[in-house]
Amino acid sequence: MTALLSPDQLEADLRAIGARLYHDQHPFHALLHHGKLDRGQVQAWALNRFEYQRCIPLKDAAILARMEDPALRRIWRQRILDHDGNSASDGGIARWLHLTDALGLDRTLVESGRALLPGTRFAVQAYLHFVREKSLLEAIASSLTELFAPNIIGQRVAGMLKHYDFVSSEALAYFEHRLTEAPRDSDFALDYVKQHADTVEKQALVKAALHFKCSVLWAQLDALHVAYVTPGIVWPDAFVPDRDASRVAA
């Protein structure tokens, strides 16, 4: 029979899931961070990743709507503000669009979503469905991938600035903000999970939620790797740098 874990034991199990399954282990990220991708491949990554960025505040709004405690809502709503900002020129979504602009992508194309890989779209929609349909505890637990974000952000920024002459620190401003936002958010979510996962069944659910979220992130990179690295099978309507030259700024 499975024993109830202490809060610290539960945290250790959650961190072990991240150490094994977080997308920093994916080969595509190794290529990205070590300068092994060309400009078109980096563009494809940024364009597809925007779909995930765009849906983060939708995910957080869905979670917020299920919170009955005003104090809890006041804390969680900061996540929405972080990404939506106070204006169209502020926030995480705007900063990601600044990155795609800097990479030479047409903003209308990026925002339209019409050049996405199907795998990207399906993975992001699966995540939105999860937080809407599962328990509040599971939805919050699914955000715990942010525990592992600062490490990959540091690798990404350092690697991209070192290896890609078409990337600047200004273009990567999104990640600078996440270095403070992600630890704040994950500390709160981890405390919530450790406090409320107070049965064996609930502890199994929160571990499964983190496992699922890791698979969402991994699936997006699988789609990118198959399409833009090897074997190079691109959905006919997805972004192709050479073919879409007319849709990408010089």
Swiss-Prot record:
Entry's transmembrane regions: none
Oxidoreductase in keyword set: yes
Protein name: Pyrroloquinoline-quinone synthase
Gene3D superfamilies found in the cross-reference section: Heme oxygenase-like (1.20.910.10)
SUPFAM superfamilies to which the protein is assigned, alphabetical: Heme oxygenase-like (SSF48613)
NCBIfam families per the UniProt record, alphabetical: PQQ_syn_pqqC
A GO molecular function held by the record: pyrroloquinoline-quinone synthase activity
